[in-house]
């Protein structure tokens, strides 16, 4: 299926950089499931011959948003379409070559809204208290577009905001990586105050119609309960804790306003609030864990910890609301929540391999690669990465088994279709994260730039495009006009 050109932003080229001029579009609340790759040339307005010439001259970048479409297209064609679900990751850790393959048996795709999201990034960055250098490294537009390929523009953007929220809170927790003597207690107090106020902002949009939903969130607050009260069917923070305005409050307000306006009137947003509570509680745990330099984690404890502080469950809870087929009851199904946790753990293990060198330099012990090396001193970085990838494969098998069990447990076809749609959201997130890591091809626009992956992709994509141009010379010239 081809996308109509009306949904594609016009592109203006200035030197090597691209600026997208957004059209006045009306963004529907729902996009039908589409295969973005089927209309790659209509989206980028480029022919294979043009792309081949550009890649040969300038290489692959992330500052030309078209390149991500062509990279995803290539990976889908070379791997998924041929039944090969093992995607290469080539990087280094402390000089050791890390050459592994991430197993992920789901179809790659990329949102047709990525061009417009990329083009409006300066406007989006103005919401944050940040620098463009830091904002570019986070590159949340890329993450959301590749992990949420079938949602509307606004719904894709809100996922980008959730990922940004995680990264900017992570920036504050990063202070705890310093030696104990260098940690400033005042900054930790500020972080504790900030996350409590962020949590309160989400509570302000939570107006459950069902008393059970109110109690579900109230009980889940756990050690945060003393800070809040139940007032007229709402959960309200005691005013004495509203001591300051956190730096990223405009971002949090933007997220809350969107959820409140777009979803709350017609859908049950309780799970979004639940996942935010889980995440904020996880950050509180992280403050404790990182602050105690003698603290160690087993691999299972690490899994449990990461289940809480991964952004994907928050993003999934929002994405679930964007689709017509939706079952709130799924969240009270232990098997479904176990599937959610497996998803978080797989993403974490993939991330650990890709961040191992950066986190080694940061002396950050909370990485499965390092935890395994502590458990088995015979492992070097490369071998430990191999073991982590094996663990990720096993977790993927558990994910697939849970998927079948959940679908078989559906009481009727309508429920089965709703569950299938919600599981698909998590599958899209998994393959999206893999592609996000594979396509880190430009320094400064990825947290973990991979020069070896860049060289590999440039060589392979050049060969692939050259074959297309050779065997379909007319099509390669004219496809952009179709």
Swiss-Prot record:
Changing residue 143 to M: Acquired activity on dimethylallyl diphosphate (DMAPP), but reduced efficiency with geranyl diphosphate (GPP) as substrate. Changing residue 167 to L: Strongly reduced activity. It catalyses: (2E)-geranyl diphosphate + L-glutamate = N-geranyl-L-glutamate + diphosphate. Its cofactor is Mg(2+). Mg(2+) 1 binds at residues 351, 355, 359. Its EC number is 2.5.1.-. The keyword Repressor does not apply. One of its GO terms (molecular function) is transferase activity. Can also use Mn(2+) ions as cofactors with a lower efficiency. InterPro entries: Isoprenoid_synthase_dom_sf. Pathway: Secondary metabolite biosynthesis. SUPFAM superfamilies: Terpenoid synthases. Changing residue 167 to A: Complete loss of activity. Keywords: Magnesium, Metal-binding, Transferase. GO terms for biological process: cellular response to carbon dioxide; cellular response to phosphate starvation. The keyword Metal-binding applies. Belongs to the terpene synthase family. Magnesium-dependent glutamate N-prenyltransferase: part of the gene cluster that mediates the biosynthesis of domoic acid (DA) and derivatives, natural products with neurochemical activity acting as ionotropic glutamate receptor (iGluR) agonists, thus being neurotoxins causing amnesic shellfish poisoning (ASP). Catalyzes the conversion of L-glutamic acid (L-Glu) to N-geranyl-L-glutamic acid (NGG) in the presence of geranyl diphosphate (GPP). Also able to catalyze the formation of farnesyl-L-glutamate from farnesyl diphosphate (FPP). Cannot use dimethylallyl diphosphate (DMAPP) as substrate. This is Magnesium-dependent glutamate N-prenyltransferase.
